[in-house]
Amino acid sequence: MEDRIKISILMDYYRELLTEKQKYVMELYFNQDLSLAEISELTNTSRQAIYDIIKRCNKLLVDYEKKLNLARKNKELIKAKQIIIEKINDLEYSNNKNDFKNSLEDIKNTIVQYI
């Protein structure tokens, strides 16, 4: 189940790097949850060919992520955004000038670290 979720996420990032047939098969298999037999019937292709396409695409998507890291970078940006929002919220309730400066410094460090 976890692998299916991972591949679905990678499809969101790298779908356009696949051929039209690969996109179609992956869409049917992962998003519409069709079996290999159902996909092979729809595409007039052997079940083994569909299996091979899915395996090849899985490897391609993982390789793209290893090289480009788009999913990982996006996850880091979301984390940085959450940290910055939390620090800004802390600033709203800070009456102490030192706390204010420290929070600003934390925000700067977060921006430098993640962005």
Curated annotation (Swiss-Prot):
User: InterPro entries, per this entry?
Assistant: RNA_pol_sigma_r3/r4-like, UPF0122, UPF0122_fam_protein, WH-like_DNA-bd_sf
| Residue ranges of coiled coil | none
Name of the protein described by the UniProt record: UPF0122 protein NT01CX_2214
According to its UniProt record, which protein family does this protein belong to? Belongs to the UPF0122 family.
Which NCBIfam families did the record assign?
PRK00118.2-2 (NF001072), YlxM (NF045758)
| Superkingdom of the organism of origin | Bacteria
SUPFAM superfamilies in the cross-refs: Sigma3 and sigma4 domains of RNA polymerase sigma factors
Task: Please explain the role this protein plays, according to its UniProt record.
Answer: Might take part in the signal recognition particle (SRP) pathway. This is inferred from the conservation of its genetic proximity to ftsY/ffh. May be a regulatory protein.
